């Protein structure tokens, strides 16, 4: 049962985002919903973002400073950061937030009220407002639908749009623990949406735009997802291998789709 004002945990992972981290943190502190804690994980930054995080004097903010990276893959380091931040958190609802993104003022309040109205909900996601910092242009985008006879999983929104019931997030992290050191091209948003799509019946994508999603040229948001070349097909095969491993872990039968065979063939073509 939820208490009147349940505690919310916002998990922020940061690596060298000095241009965005202050706006990110302030967007959390300025939330209209006040019963929050903010866990900031700095992953060995060497720019001014680390200094800013150290300077924050607010009882709502808890800080973790990683001393060394464990993986060459940024996605695996992100997963490690979120796992360690979650262990430090106490909230009943867990929000994920990349340090180059931000929340609109009423996001947490809207999500909490939605969870309260439907206590069976395990996962919520809103739509992102794409922000292009070089021009300060912003645009709203909505998820496209897929014909799933040709696709194994649906389109999904980025990490910073995601929120989980604590018990469900804990279960998710435990059940994908086989992948903690594998599938280096997969960010946590891909792992989460695949897990949720196949193994949760209680999730919802809100028709709301409550997250600023920064198209950071330093990050993964622009270059890697639009070019459907060899790297794109290789990453897609890794996603399929993750799905198979997840089904094996869950002791469920997995049937390969047309999408899998097309992806496999394209990898063979590029390999040759």
Give names to the regions the model predicted.
Residues 26-35:
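Short, acidic, metal-binding catalytic loop of nucleotide-sugar glycosyltransferases
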Residues 94:
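Short aromatic/hydrophobic "clamp" motif used to bind/position activated sugar donors
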Residues 66-86, 108-174, 240-244:
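Flexible acidic/His/Gly-enriched loops in nucleotide-sugar-dependent glycosyltransferase catalytic domains
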Residues 42-51, 68, 98:
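A conserved acidic beta->alpha catalytic loop
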Residues 147-227:
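Conserved nucleotide-sugar donor-binding catalytic segment
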Residues 1-27:
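N-proximal low-complexity "stem/linker" segments adjacent to membrane-targeting elements
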Residues 97, 103-107, 130, 164, ...:
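Hydrophobic/aromatic residue at the end of a short beta strand that borders the catalytic acidic motif
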Residues 48, 101-114:
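Acidic donor-binding/catalytic loop of UDP-sugar-dependent glycosyltransferases
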